[in-house]
């Protein structure tokens, strides 16, 4: 039994703690719904325009976009489903990145009449 004690898998948190300072970054994933409360779904060209005009200038070092399908339990007790886009950003944990991310959330909500843009943050260790 004592031999097995050394076989535990370290947690993700421990991995970040042992990451070299130069490799410590933040991963933020934003989830953008594509349905409007009224009217047509947000089109591919509208999404591309948002990425090209709003996201890329703020995160020039790179980004990743995934097609997604979201669902949640509405206040009415019914499951709502919606096509979505997930935008993954790897960035420094700094005030400018924070400002840029919040700007993107605000722009998208305003431009496309969205109630929210979900945000998930986690520390990561990045190597190229």
Task: Label every model-predicted segment.
Residues 3-6:
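C-terminal motif of bacterial Sec signal peptides marking the signal peptidase cleavage site
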Residues 23-44:
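Terminal, regulation- and interaction-focused segments at domain boundaries
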Residues 35-37, 70, 126:
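Short, catalytically relevant binding-site loops at active-site mouths
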Residues 79-128:
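Helix-rich interaction surfaces within compact, conserved domain-sized segments
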Residues 39-52, 97-109:
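Surface-exposed flexible segments
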Residues 46-84, 89-95:
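Mature extracytoplasmic domains of secretory-pathway proteins
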């Amino acid at each position: 039994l004592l031999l097995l004690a050394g076989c535990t898998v370290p947690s993700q948190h421990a991995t970040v703690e042992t990451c070299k300072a130069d490799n410590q970054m933040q991963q933020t994933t934003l989830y953008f719904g594509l349905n409007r409360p009224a009217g047509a779904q947000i089109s591919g060209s509208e999404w591309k325009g948002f990425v090209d005009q709003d996201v890329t200038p703020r995160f020039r070092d790179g980004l990743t976009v995934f097609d997604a399908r979201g669902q949640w339990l509405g206040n009415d007790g019914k499951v709502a489903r919606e096509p979505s886009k997930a935008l993954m950003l790897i960035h420094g944990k700094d005030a400018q990145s924070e400002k840029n991310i919040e700007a993107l959330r605000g722009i998208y909500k305003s431009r496309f009449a969205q109630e929210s843009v979900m945000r998930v943050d986690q520390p990561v260790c990045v190597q190229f």
